């Protein structure tokens, strides 16, 4: 029966909407990631085909306390819309207040982080830590939805561990709270990022006849081809790409790019980040992407040059290294 459903969904796919935001048919979304999804990177991901992008996730407590570095993460460019801002925290009142602050910069979506597994977040009862306290998680969701008029969405995981796979019931509960879409990462908190993402439960949530909100799948998607297989096999409304985008904004592109072109894209990302901040912060933001970019993987005798590239403190020095890489390898 599900095979027939998959064929039907593949042939008669309709545009995905979050509230009134039309993301088109089978959209790819950029996941919110701390120290990764800065504005320069988001702009490039958008250019290469991301239907929607998200800022770095931000702490509700830091927003309420007006911490300047956190407030800077709320900057949105008109050309990157639709864009979402994701917040995390464990207190309903502060999350609602943070959502009101976020709404003042007019994002298209406010997303609630109930999935981050790292110790500094989940260990304090926020992010995926809330999967151990569903009543509080739902209280936060209702409080935020009641505080803002912007569509509210949620990103979460399958459950805390394999003995507590709660996503099927949780999806219904979150929908009943009034969320506009749900993103599910196909791992538990205990798995962190180990093993492989299990899309089986994501597909079950999507097939649940009670569920009518968009379901976005996330986990181990590294290309458009893999995203297509996820759409075909599990029937999800959208696919979110996270770690595979590090240093690789072209992962959203429909056409294959050459390495020289990819290097030019990284150079543009560097320039955008420097222009929007300053040389020090622009290089710092870009350095993380250079360290992760697949175009530098496996280059022979590149170790010394790589260290120089990641230690460079001047834009011209990094661009000079790019030129050297072009001549030696591409």
Model-derived segments and spans:
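Alpha/beta enzyme core
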Residues: 97-110, 114-124, 135-213
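Alpha/beta catalytic cores of nucleotide-metabolism and tRNA/nucleoside-modifying enzymes
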Residues: 11-24, 28, 34, 39-40, ...
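Active-site beta-loop-alpha junctions enriched in small/polar residues
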Residues: 33-35, 58-60, 88-90, 115-117, ...
